[in-house]
Amino acid sequence: MAPNETVFRRDLPLAGVYGCVQTHGLVPLLIRLVTRSPFDHVFISTGGGQIIEAEPGGVRIRDIAEYAGCRIEYNTGEPMTDIQRAAVAEYASSKRGEPYAWAADAVDGLRCLGLRWRILARFERARRSVMCSELAAQAGQYAGLDWNCGQDDPCQVTPAMLARRPGMQPGT
């Protein structure tokens, strides 16, 4: 098996675990280049092979098998209680249908390039949409976990930041 190849089992990952994934395409490649990370997307497992994620089109539930062949790392090495895992999955599921935050992706890109204007923070807080890493950070907050990666607000968290947290392990 190649080092970046992921084997999928329907019983993994556990509910409440987030996964950082390296997807295919031009936009994901640009995200990885700007954030200097091998990962460009984040999802949350709801168990039974199902995940919830913020993507173009909004927050939706999908099957983990859609990422077969993609490199994935999960935060399975992070200590969490069953109650915290359930809370993460519950929160993420409650956001189903919420719009995707295209503008937030642009703001994150500007930040990664070194632009940190105050107006960017005001813009982020005023929106009513969510991006993938923000959804994970918010779900962590809801469960009493600090997944903000040192940022003041979940809307400032990127997939790269979540992937660099302790406890990340290759998907199995």
Regions from the language model: what does each represent?
Residues 2-40, 47, 52-56, 60, ...:
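N-terminal capping segments
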